[in-house]
Design a protein with these regions (language model features):
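C-terminal substrate-binding/active-site "lid" region of AdoMet-derived donor-dependent transferases
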Residues: 2-5, 67-69, 98-101, 128, ...
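Class I SAM-dependent methyltransferase Rossmann-like catalytic core
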Residues: 2-62
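Glycine-rich helix-loop-beta junction characteristic of Rossmann-like nucleotide cofactor-binding loops
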Residues: 55-61, 121-122, 160-161
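Conserved class I S-adenosyl-L-methionine
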Residues: 62-72
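Glycine-centered, small-residue-biased loops immediately flanking beta-strands
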Residues: 64, 85, 166
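Conserved SAM-binding loop of SAM-dependent methyltransferases across substrates and taxa
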Residues: 73-84
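Conserved SAM-binding motif I beta-strand of class I
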Residues: 86-91
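S-adenosyl-L-methionine
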Residues: 92-137
């Protein structure tokens, strides 16, 4: 995977954009992994995180049942399907269809959505992926607590849906109690 650094691209117009939006857009325009993801047909650069972890730990095996939480825009779902997995994915935001995957739109924290995920899986999941992030408020403590609460909810659900020996891959922003979460069973 090669991501050569191109010449710096500047934002042509900043009209109507906040400073943070301008910074994000400039970063996107100049990120070699964004360009590489587009060239390879992936929906987001985050696919390379999953690919690296899969290559290192052998997480995604052909035929495995995979639950993808916080799936939009769908690059992790795309990758898991490409690896031959049976994927059920959910996000608050709509997800463009991915051939071979079951996609749901809804709040993962809603018990009705959790029940539907279990039904759609058709059995225990071999791996649960979560690239979810709580909506940011800009207040560090509140954001950290929300992220930790979301991570705990993912782990609680993993205990319900994972097959014995199953894996849970969870993105968590470091801070506070986050150091305790990886030790959870």
């Amino acid at each position: 995977m090669s991501a050569e650094r191109p010449l710096r691209t500047k934002l042509r117009t900043a009209q109507g954009r906040s400073t943070s939006s301008q910074r994000w857009l400039t970063r996107q325009l100049n990120d070699p992994f964004v360009r590489l993801a587009r060239q390879q047909g992936w929906r987001a650069r985050s696919v390379f995180k999953l690919q690296e972890l899969d290559e290192r730990f052998g997480l995604l095996r052909r035929g495995a049942r995979v639950l993808d939480l916080g799936a939009a825009p769908g690059s992790w779902t795309q990758y898991a399907v490409k690896r031959g997995c049976r994927v059920v994915a959910v996000d608050l935001e709509p997800i463009e269809p991915v051939a071979g995957a079951v996609l749901l739109q809804g709040d993962f924290l809603d018990p009705a959505i959790q029940q539907e995920l279990k039904e759609r899986l058709g059995g225990p999941a071999e791996i649960m992926l979560s690239d979810m992030a709580a909506h940011a408020t800009g207040r560090r403590l509140v954001d950290r607590l929300r992220a930790e609460g979301l991570g705990e909810s993912v782990l609680e659900f993993a205990a319900e849906v994972l097959a014995p020996g199953g894996d849970c891959l969870l993105k968590l922003i470091k801070g506070g109690e986050a150091a305790l979460l990886p030790r959870a069973n």
